[in-house]
Swiss-Prot record:
Alphabetical keyword list: Cytoplasm, DNA replication, DNA-directed DNA polymerase, Nucleotidyltransferase, Transferase
Species: Streptomyces coelicolor (strain ATCC BAA-471 / A3(2) / M145)
Functional summary from the UniProt entry: DNA polymerase III is a complex, multichain enzyme responsible for most of the replicative synthesis in bacteria. This DNA polymerase also exhibits 3' to 5' exonuclease activity. The alpha chain is the DNA polymerase.
Compartments in which it is found: Cytoplasm
Main location: cytoplasm
Family that this chain belongs to: Belongs to the DNA polymerase type-C family. DnaE subfamily.
Protein name: DNA polymerase III subunit alpha
Gene: dnaE
């Protein structure tokens, strides 16, 4: 008689993080190969994989069984202690987290059971967390047991653990308790056999309990991978989890064998006993209980907005739009805007989304009312006039040619997706608001799956195999570079059919010729793509009208109590849960700070939304490419494009951000646009028949397809598509599937023929639209973000000190970016001063038109409380007249030696006339004295002055009447100390005066290397000062070093590997000015230079007769200007050479004025700044 087919019920997928290595596709393929109709998942303590498992199984034709191998607290889940199960000598028999939990396997038989598993898993994270285990207990299991079938679990189950410890009666009671909870026919004795002693030792006891209580046996295989040959990869995965090497004899490993998906015959053949045979057959009983009806069904879970009495959701939505239109157009709503608003409202109501708009508009309005900066729009939502009316966006879509159907398409119903930018510092306040408004159980952050990518798989595998770090590092560097952030997978190395196979020649050669490399990569293939950890979406929030745990499980991050879904956002969205993106945009923070600073510094109230979009000063800045620090326009190549394009209207700003992307740039669209705009390239129509009908669509982009909206409009005008149908066509074109394109071309051609166009014209248009549809950009997004670019450009052009101060504050924790923007301030003629206890605020602050003060909070070792106290005491008691006066006035919390030393070295007391060296020699005993007095004063023993000093003196006593030395440290030491405290050279720079020396031999500034000007592998020479040096040894005993080389605008790590180091080691000295030639390595997040040569420049005459370098945009060169410049240079005759950096649209040319020699003094510099502007001397 044939045996019933076996069903695997104890299966750990890759979602048993770093413990399960079973990939879902492999599992279901194996089931189909072995004729198994059902399979369960039972991951450790979570349901992260439930959605993926369910739908992947259904797709493969296998019935999914959703289960969990739960952690069960031995007492209450709220009790955060471990218990001692047995005597010390029985420790080996306690395999239950050292008394922290036991295991239990449970499976959902129907939709009710599935949702009860959601509840159990979620509560385990929320209330049962202990160290790293989310634990349920008998109370919660009893409460949510309906629809669930369970077993005694693996050898770590409570019943088995008590049996191993010799506690039969306790084991019997535990089994009886669970039988009562689940029911007589829904609780089983779980039998396993992997050839290990702890499984066999309790078998008789388990079966005895079964006989006494009538509990049937159930055989499982503790599967952790799909195929037997994957045991080695799984072993490596365990080592990745524990941080051990495979060769470590004491590492965690699985005892026994056979942890894969065995066939029915293999499972029955393990043991011929009746109990085992019955247990195998009983797996079919559970399979037959499974009813997946209603599982993972999509529902309408839109959060419910509170509607005022007398309105329905629809009528209140219409009323809000009406009021919003009146606010936006106080002089009367134009007819075209009103008509569009009515059309959009009809579509939104028809699609069932009025509640969505009300919810979004509400929290945006709340944020604005709280003074939280909100972006003007993002993505396709900016194409909706309803969104504009309701305050969701701040850009009128009609003048910019934006299309509503790009946002909501009545031809293709899908959830609207509005992403909102907030001031990054206050984004959490908005999330808190919606959490409180809709309920903490109805709002959660969104989980993400962190997978083991190819390069990490290589590094991890090299480590667990015992190879040195250099092995993994060498292999990852030989991998092809990422393309658009996506790396090649490891199969691409050896699979000739892989699209990137040809790029992997270097690592393939190593794989084929070096056995150790082959071993590493083969091991890496076994773990690549597995889920390593759960993370949290940077911006995504799930909102629901019902408790989220009724529809999806959650987990809790116990460092801050944040609730997070166990699934990612596409999975959550497919169930009807609303996903919103609450994004933090640093530039909103910068603009908010700058606007407030303009008010405090100049008394001007700026309203960004009211700014004219044709400010000449702003467009002059853009045309010069002076956009370092301007949103989206910060990079070197982008600045070059701006100089070439010469934008003079807002449409250009929108276009440049759309064009500056790999697709359009690969087709030279950015250059063609710039040339056509400036009359340097003829504007040719796509076809003469199409010139007039497409004139309105293409005129703004000089005949080029730049935007997705243009593709839609062209299909509407030429082929008669509705804008909704055209959006679907655009998506088809973007995917470039030949069969779909062919089918759609027939429809497109028919529509165009009907409108009277020739086949030649139709084909010409199609041939242009198809490639560009994939590259064209969403104009709604580029226009909305273009507005932010314009605002930041406006602030930099019109309020440079305030804007740059806000910009420096935003990057104060990134010293490389701080150096770039500090140098930009110098170029702009803005003086950045060291911190000053009498003037500085917490952050960078503008003073007047051309001074920025360093913020006190940017000083190392100076905490927020200290800064607040310094400012508070200064406001209450007046400025500090001297260092003793400072110690007298500030609170005791400020009188900290480490803090005070940092402030001294940073220059915060320079204004008082004390030298830093003099203060450093005296501050410690002074603090000792004043702290003792302040302590007694706080205890009420006496007043600080208390008659102890001269009654007529304004100076405090108690050892504070000190004479300070007037000597100062030498410049090198002083600047080194300043840099240590501020992370930057501020008051001066060791390289000032040496710019001409560096520019003579350096190929580029360091900021150009760390930006996008140079690609990976480029051989370049940089110049600067060695500001940090680490000497190291390889495992083979060879010396090498990492030198940090810094110039005026950035720093870069230079790797001197042994061969090079041996030649230059004596020249590698901190504070030395050097040139380094090397190969740029940009494969990691932070670029580095692999040094090939080191050169020491001759600085003996560097400070004398240094050339005067003038930076002049080519557009400024006019005969009157040249004439006046000659007069100035002649008037200030001297011995220094004059050079001009002539900034053209794509490159800068350096000219030497051999006829002129000048005296570089303030008088010359003043005349030059009047003629050429304050930034002409900044190089």
């Amino acid at each position: 008689m044939s045996k019933p087919p076996f069903t695997h019920l104890h299966v750990h997928t890759q979602y048993s993080l770093l413990d399960g290595a079973a990939r879902l596709k492999d599992m279901f393929d194996a089931c189909n190969e072995m004729g198994m109709s059902h399979i369960a998942m039972s991951d450790h303590g979570n349901l992260h994989g439930a959605y993926d498992f369910f739908h992947s199984a259904k797709k493969a034709g296998v019935t999914p069984i959703i289960g969990i191998e739960a952690y069960v607290a031995p007492e209450s889940r709220r009790n955060k202690r471990k218990i001692q199960w047995g005597q010390p000598h029985q420790k080996r028999d306690d395999v239950s987290g050292s008394g922290g939990y036991t295991h239990k396997t449970m499976w959902a038989t129907n939709s009710k059971g599935l949702h009860n598993l959601f509840r159990l898993s979620s509560d385990a994270y929320a209330e049962g967390w202990l160290q790293k285990w989310p634990r349920m207990d008998k109370e919660t299991i009893s409460q949510w047991s309906e629809g669930i079938v369970a077993s005694t679990g693996c050898p770590s189950g409570e019943v088995q653990t008590r049996l191993r410890l010799g506690h039969f009666d306790e084991a019997l009671k535990a089994a009886a308790d669970y039988q009562d909870i689940f029911g007589k026919d829904r609780y089983f004795l779980e039998l396993m056999d992997h050839g290990i002693e702890i499984e066999h030792r309790v078998r008789d006891g388990l079966l005895e309990i079964g006989r006494k209580l009538g509990i049937p046996p159930l055989v499982t295989n503790d599967s952790h991978y799909t195929y037997a040959h994957e045991a080695t990869a799984h072993d490596a995965l365990l080592c990745i989890q524990t941080g051990k090497n495979l060769s470590d004899p004491d590492r965690f490993r699985f005892d026994g064998t056979g942890y894969y998906l065995k066939s029915t015959d293999e499972m029955y053949a393990i043991d011929s006993s009746d109990a085992w045979q019955e247990g195998c057959a009983n797996t079919r009983l559970i399979a037959e209980m499974i009813d997946t009806t209603g599982m993972f069904e999509k529902r309408d879970l839109m959060p419910k907005f509170d509607i005022p009495e007398g309105f329905t959701e629809i009528t209140w939505f219409q009323e809000e739009v009406r009021r919003g239109m009146e606010r936006r157009f106080p002089g009367g709503v134009p007819e075209d805007r009103q008509k569009q608003a009515e059309y959009e409202m009809d579509v939104i109501i028809q699609m069932g989304f009025p509640g969505y708009f009300l919810v979004v508009a509400d929290f945006i309005m709340w944020a604005k009312n709280q003074g939280i900066a909100v972006g003007p729009g993002r993505g396709s939502a900016a194409g909706s006039i309803v969104a504009y009316a309701m305050g969701i966006t701040d850009l009128d879509p009609i003048p910019h040619g934006l299309i509503f159907e790009r946002f909501l398409n009545p031809e293709r119903v899908s959830m609207p997706d509005v992403d909102i930018d907030f001031d990054e510092r206050r984004r959490v306040e908005v999330i808190r608001y919606v959490t409180e408004k809709y309920g903490a159980d109805k709002v959660a952050m969104i989980g993400t799956y962190g997978k083991i990518k190819a390069k990490n798989a290589i590094k991890d595998s090299a480590r667990v195999l015992g190879y040195p770090y250099a092995m993994g590092d060498r292999l990852t560097k030989a991998m092809p570079a990422d393309v658009l952030g996506k790396g090649i997978d490891l199969n691409g190395i050896t699979d000739p059919t892989h699209p990137r196979y040809s790029e992997a020649g270097e690592i393939r050669s190593m794989y084929e010729s070096e056995p150790d490399v082959k071993k590493v990569i083969d091991t890496a293939k076994g773990v690549e793509g597995l889920v390593r950890q759960m993370g949290v979406h940077a911006a995504g929030v799930i909102m629901s009208s019902e408790p989220i745990v009724d529809h999806a499980p959650i987990w809790v991050r116990h460092t801050d109590g944040v609730t997070i879904t166990q699934w990612d956002y596409p999975q959550c969205e497919s169930l009807g849960l609303l996903k919103m993106d609450f994004l933090g945009l640093r530039n909103l923070t910068i603009m908010d700070d700058a606007v407030k600073m303009v008010k405090s510094n100049k008394g001007i109230d700026l309203d960004l939304l009211s700014l004219p979009l044709d400010d000449p000063t702003t467009f002059e800045l853009l045309q010069r490419g002076d956009t370092l620090g301007v949103f989206q326009f910060d990079g070197g190549p982008m600045r070059s494009l701006l100089r070439l394009m010469k934008p003079d209207n807002f449409e250009d700003i929108s276009a440049v951000s759309a064009l500056y992307r790999p697709g359009p740039m690969g087709m030279d669209s950015h250059t063609n646009y710039a040339l056509r705009k400036n009359g340097l390239q003829e504007i040719t129509p796509i076809h003469k028949e199409l010139e007039e009908p497409l004139q309105e669509v293409l005129a703004v982009t000089y005949g080029l397809i730049v935007y997705q909206e243009q593709v839609q409009k062209a299909a509407q005008i030429i082929a008669g598509y509705s804008l909704g149908e055209a959006d679907i066509l655009r998506r088809v074109m973007g995917k470039k599937k030949p069969d779909e394109l062919a089918k759609n071309f027939v429809l497109f051609q028919a529509g165009a023929r009907k409108n009277g166009y020739s086949d030649e014209a139709i084909q010409a248009l199609w041939d242009v639209l198809v490639p560009f549809a994939g590259y064209a950009f969403n104009k709604a997004h580029s226009a909305a973000y273009g507005l932010v670019s314009y605002w930041t450009g406006y602030l930099k052009a019109n309020y440079p000190a305030e804007y740059m101060a806000a910009l420096l504050t935003s990057v104060k924790d990134d010293k490389d970016k701080s150096a770039v923007y500090l140098n930009e301030c110098r170029r702009m003629g803005i003086k950045v001063l060291p911190p000053n206890v009498n003037e500085s605020m917490s952050n960078f602050a503008a003073q007047g038109d051309d001074v920025i003060l360093f913020g006190l909070s940017a000083v190392r070792n100076v905490g927020t409380n200290v800064v607040e106290s310094i400012i508070k005491c200064r406001k209450a008691k007046g400025k500090y007249a001297s260092f003793p006066d400072y110690l007298d006035k500030v609170e005791a919390v400020v009188c900290n030696k480490r803090t005070t030393e940092s402030l001294i070295k940073a220059g915060a007391f320079d204004e008082m006339g004390h030298t830093r060296k003099g203060l450093t020699a005296q501050y410690e005993p002074m603090i000792d004295n004043v702290v003792a007095v302040k302590r007694k004063e706080a205890e009420g023993q006496f007043d600080l002055f208390g008659g102890m000093g001269d009654e007529q003196s304004d100076e405090p006593g108690f050892g504070l009447d000190v004479v300070f030395g007037e000597d100062e440290w030498d410049k090198t030491y002083l600047l080194a100390q300043e840099r240590e405290m501020l992370g930057l050279y501020v008051s001066d720079h060791p390289l000032f005066g040496l710019e001409h020396v560096l520019s003579d031999k350096a190929d580029a500034g360091i900021s150009q290397l760390t930006g996008g000007d140079f690609g990976d592998g480029a051989v370049v020479t940089i110049g600067g000062i060695i500001s940090g040096l680490q000497r190291k040894m390889t495992k083979q005993g060879n010396a090498w070093a990492i030198a940090t080389v810094e110039d005026l605008a950035g720093s870069l790590e230079c790797m001197f590997f042994p061969a090079t180091y041996q030649l230059v080691s004596t020249q590698l000295v901190e504070d030395a000015v050097v040139f380094v030639k090397g190969r740029l390595d940009k494969r990691e997040d932070v670029p580095r230079l692999v040094a090939m040569e080191l050169m020491i420049p001759d600085l003996s005459n560097a400070g004398t007769n240094a050339p005067v370098v003038l930076t002049i945009p080519a557009t400024r060169i006019t005969p009157p200007m040249v004439s006046r410049l000659g007069e100035i240079l002649t008037h200030h005759r001297g011995d220094s050479e004059v050079r001009i950096k002539l900034q053209g649209p794509t490159k800068t040319t350096v000219l030497r004025l051999d006829r002129h020699r000048v005296k570089p003094d303030p008088a010359l510099f003043g005349d030059l700044k009047v003629l050429l502007g304050p930034s002409c001397l900044a190089g």
